Amino acid sequence: MDIELSYKAKQVMANCIAMAEQAFKRSFPIPSLTFNVRGKAAGKAYLQLNEIRLNPKLFKENPQAFLKEVIPHEVAHLIAYQVYGRVRPHGKEWQGVMEAVFKVPAKTTHSFDVASVQGKTFEYRCGCMTYPLSIRRHNKVLRKEAVYSCQKCRQPLSFTGTQLS
């Protein structure tokens, strides 16, 4: 991971913690930060470990969005857990931390271009449309561990034989 980006990420994390300490009038431990999330997820918060993991490839491609949105998003999960205990991941407690404490819109998903991190996908079909399935889901179908169904017509999806990416 780029040293400068890593430093900026830690600064943003520390600023978020400082804002939370001021808002809740208590101290919070500084979370550990790693850069080992893969796939399409931008980041993950591990509540019991007080750890934030970020996707290094998406971070390098979208540094400003990570610093302004993704890192506060993940820190807000940790703060909500430490203040309120087990709550819904994007529930009112988390939204309150995002909007009232961090002054960041409480968005639950990112809109980054994921072409550089997207794994292989395979085309599946039902009675009304086609679906791209990830390699993980495709392999579960092949091993007969899962059957996926269309959300519209409820028919089981079947592999067309085409790899999309």
UniProtKB/Swiss-Prot annotation:
Residues of the SprT-like domain: 21-158
Top-rank lineage group of the source organism: Bacteria
Binding-site list for Zn(2+): 73, 77
A GO cellular component annotation in the UniProt record: cytoplasm
UniProt-annotated catalytic positions: 74
Taxonomy of the source species: Bacteria, Pseudomonadati, Pseudomonadota, Gammaproteobacteria, Vibrionales
Family according to the record: Belongs to the SprT family.
The protein, known as: Protein SprT
Keyword Thylakoid: no
Subcellular location: Cytoplasm
Alphabetical GO biological process terms: response to stress
GO molecular-function terms, A-Z: zinc ion binding
Cofactor: Zn(2+)
Native source species: Vibrio campbellii (strain ATCC BAA-1116)
Keyword Metal-binding: yes
Cofactor: how and how many bound: Binds 1 zinc ion.
Residue spans crossing the bilayer: none
Keywords: Cytoplasm, Metal-binding, Zinc
Matches recorded under PANTHER family: PROTEIN SPRT
